[in-house]
Each structure stands twice: as C-alpha cells, then as structure tokens.
C-alpha cells in the first residue's frame, strides 16, 4: 500500500486540529492513511469514514466521573499487566504509574511508561479506595464520597491493583 506524504503547508495549517497517533502510546504499531492525512482520509477511501477525533480518544485518554455518591477514574492501560502498574494516594492526589521494561513484539523491541496524577475531591473516603484492572485492559479507580463535615482520612498509601476476568463496563469512546 502506497501512502501519500502530506505537504508541509497542509501539516502546518491543520496539524493542531488533527492530532496524530505518532506521539501517543500506540507509537510503533504502524500507521494508517488517516494518521498522515486525517482530513483527506474520506477522499482516499470514500466509503470509509474515520472519525477525526478517534485518535485522541484511543490514545489512553482517561475518563473521570464525580457524582454525588462516588468518584471514579477509567484509564485504558491495555499494554500493562497489574504487576506493571503502581497506584498511590498522596494526600489529595492519586498517582497512577505504569512501566514495562523493553520486550520484543512484532516490530522489534518496545518499552512503555506513563504517569498520571489526579486530584481527589476533598470528600472522598480515602480508606475505602479500590483499583481493578478488567480483562480488556481498563483500569478502574474508585472511592465512595462521605457527607460534608466527616473526615475523609487523608494519608499516603499504595492501592493494590486487582485483576478482573470480565471486560470493563466503562463506556468505550
């Protein structure tokens, strides 16, 4: 398959509005036509319409939900096992770190690492926080909220990541 190279003026003019998979966690998995020219991908293949924002949503973007009763973080970590993940609570923040050492895949050797930090709402019960990894690679971090005026127990501690055998119930983008 020949891939047309986009012109520099095109890249400069539309680049900020059409992010590429080149710099996300899928680096090294190969390129598609829409990675190089997302705006023109429908003209190259008129019967196939690729969402212009698909690459942003598929690049490990997390989803944070905070409702009246609980706080939940969904994070796609499909390239990591529970042993590769560290989840810590440091005062009002949760830090999620994933790293796996260099290993061989279809295209050569690859290593991955990420670090995410989220602020916890002040009324989250930090003694009841939990973290699980679904079979499809969705990390779910959650904690119940306590009524206002009740001490939520802020301290530093590690949260173990448990493995679930069923796929995640988180909405897919």
UniProtKB/Swiss-Prot annotation:
Domain sHSP intervals: 52-162
What are the protein's GO molecular function terms?
identical protein binding; metal ion binding; structural constituent of eye lens; unfolded protein binding
Give the region (Disordered) as residue ranges. Answer: 144-173
Is Phosphoprotein a UniProt keyword of this protein?
Answer: yes
Q: Where is this region: Required for complex formation with BFSP1 and BFSP2?
A: 1-63
Specify which residues bind Zn(2+) 2 according to the UniProt entry for this protein.
107
* Residue positions binding Zn(2+) 3: 154
Q: Which residues of the sequence carry a binding annotation for Zn(2+) 1?
A: 100, 102
Modified residue N-acetylmethionine is at which positions? 1
Name the job this protein performs: Contributes to the transparency and refractive index of the lens. Acts as a chaperone, preventing aggregation of various proteins under a wide range of stress conditions. Required for the correct formation of lens intermediate filaments as part of a complex composed of BFSP1, BFSP2 and CRYAA.
- Protein name as catalogued: Alpha-crystallin A chain
């Amino acid at each position: 398959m020949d891939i047309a190279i986009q012109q520099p003026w095109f890249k400069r003019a539309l680049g900020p509005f059409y992010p590429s998979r080149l710099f996300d966690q899928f680096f090294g998995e190969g390129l598609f036509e829409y990675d190089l020219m997302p705006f023109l991908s429908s003209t190259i293949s008129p019967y196939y319409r690729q969402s212009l924002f698909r690459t942003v949503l598929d690049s490990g973007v997390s989803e944070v939900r905070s409702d009246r009763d609980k706080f939940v973080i969904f994070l796609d970590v499909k390239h990591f096992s529970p042993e590769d993940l560290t989840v810590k609570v440091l005062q009002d923040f949760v830090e999620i770190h994933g790293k796996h050492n260099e290993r061989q895949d279809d295209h050569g050797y690859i290593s991955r690492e990420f670090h995410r930090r989220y602020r916890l709402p002040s009324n989250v019960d930090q003694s009841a926080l939990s973290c699980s990894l679904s079979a499809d690679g969705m990390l779910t971090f959650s904690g119940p909220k306590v009524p206002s005026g009740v001490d939520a127990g802020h301290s530093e501690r590690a949260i173990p990541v448990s493995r679930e055998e069923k796929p995640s119930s988180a909405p897919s983008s």
